[in-house]
Structure formats: C-alpha cells, structure tokens
Amino acid sequence: MITLVHRCALAVLLLGASTWAHAQTLTVSAAASLGDAMKAIAPLFEAQHPGVTLRFNLAASGVLLQQLAAGAPVDVLATADEDTLDRAAAQKLIDPATRRVLATNALVLVAPAGSGLAGLDALTGPSVKRIALGKSASVPAGRYAQQALESRGQWSALQPKLVPADNVRQVLDYVARGEVEAGFVYATDAASAAGKVRVVATVGGHAPIRYPVAVVSTSAQPALARAFVQFLASPAAQAVLKQQGFGAP
C-alpha cells in the first residue's frame, strides 16, 4: 500500500513531468545513501552532455519501487540492494539488459560521538534503551541489520528497543542528535557525519551490500539513461564513489 507521504512524492514527480519534457532532464531515483555521491557525480556527467540536467529523487529503495510501480516518470533506478531491483525486474519496470552493480558498502553500528558503547553485545544492556534502524519492509539497511541481529541471536531480545526509520539518513540523524543510543547505518553515512557519530563496530552476518542500477523501461529518453548508467562505471564516477567511502562493484 502506498502511504499518503508516498503519494505526495509521486504527485510532485508527476506534476513536474510536463516541464521536464521540454528540457533534457534525466530523472534518477536513487537510494538515500547514494545521495551525496550522486550529487557529486552529476556535474561530471553534465559537463560531458551539454544541455542535460540530472534530477535526483532520493528515498528508501522500497519507496522508490512503489513510486515507479505507480507511474512516476523516472529514467534510472538505483537501489541499495539486489532484492528491490529484482522485484522491479519481475514487474518489468526496468530494462534488465542495462542492469549493473555500481558500488558496494558495509553496515556499521554507530553511537553518538560521546557515547561509551562498547560493541554489539552491549545493545542488550540496560544503558541502551533505543536502537534506530530502517524499516525492513522498505529500507535495505534495516533488512541487513535484521539479518545480522538474527545471526547473532539478538533480534527477538532487542524488539522493545527498536526505533524504525524511513531511511538510513533518518537513522543517522537520530543518532547524531542523541535521540537514540545506537543505530545501524552504512559506513558511507557514518563517514559523512564524522564528529557527530562514532563507529562502534562493523557488522557482519548479512547479505552482501551491493548497489545495482538500471534504466527504467518506461524512460522517455532511454539512450540518455543508458549513457548515465554506463557513466557510473567510468573511472571518474568510480573515483567519486570511492572518495565517498563506497567499495568497488
């Protein structure tokens, strides 16, 4: 079911469609954790394609899929997990021939900068009352965190402490503001908030974190969309992703 918030986001995309049609604007729906990297890559691509403007729609991967399924005018879809793009492919929402992995990442446990949290085992202790993580239904980082906690036998015991978030950046904000004692985010997100949060531990026990990307099957400008997907594999784009802390595909 698409919530009111998701409908509003979709409406914004639809209302702008007629305007974008008169300019060469490429709309890229990307996982929230890719936001900083995509914005840094944009001017590099635009410099090679005069007259082209990249527009980014950033949200949790599951929300992006819902928007696309509801008819959002999108050209490229980049998610934070393979499963979401698999579902997009099953619904024939993407061109499978254009699919590729653009980057990898790691899951980390973070705490406020001044916290004395010692590790994952400390999450069950009395000093930790709130733990933020993405909603597993729509946020891949939340699913990775659940897999990790299940593999450690902590998932059930920690249920009363869990604070669900709409995306991984919201988790980061909760931790940075000290509203929770801990949270699960990507290593790249933690690096972007250095000084406000600290990495307590790198988390294992989950599926590999890969970021796949593909051209949307209903793109109004598929050639340009393919060019952008190909550009993401270029040395220039990969250098930006590496600088942002992402791993190689």
Which residue ranges define each predicted feature?
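Bacterial N-terminal signal peptides that target proteins for export
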Residues: 1-12, 19-20
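Short, linear, compositionally biased motifs with a strong N-terminal bias
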Residues: 14-15, 83
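Local alpha-helix boundary/kink/capping signal
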Residues: 15-17, 218
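Exported/periplasmic ABC-transporter solute-binding proteins
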Residues: 23-49, 53-70, 79-82, 86-249
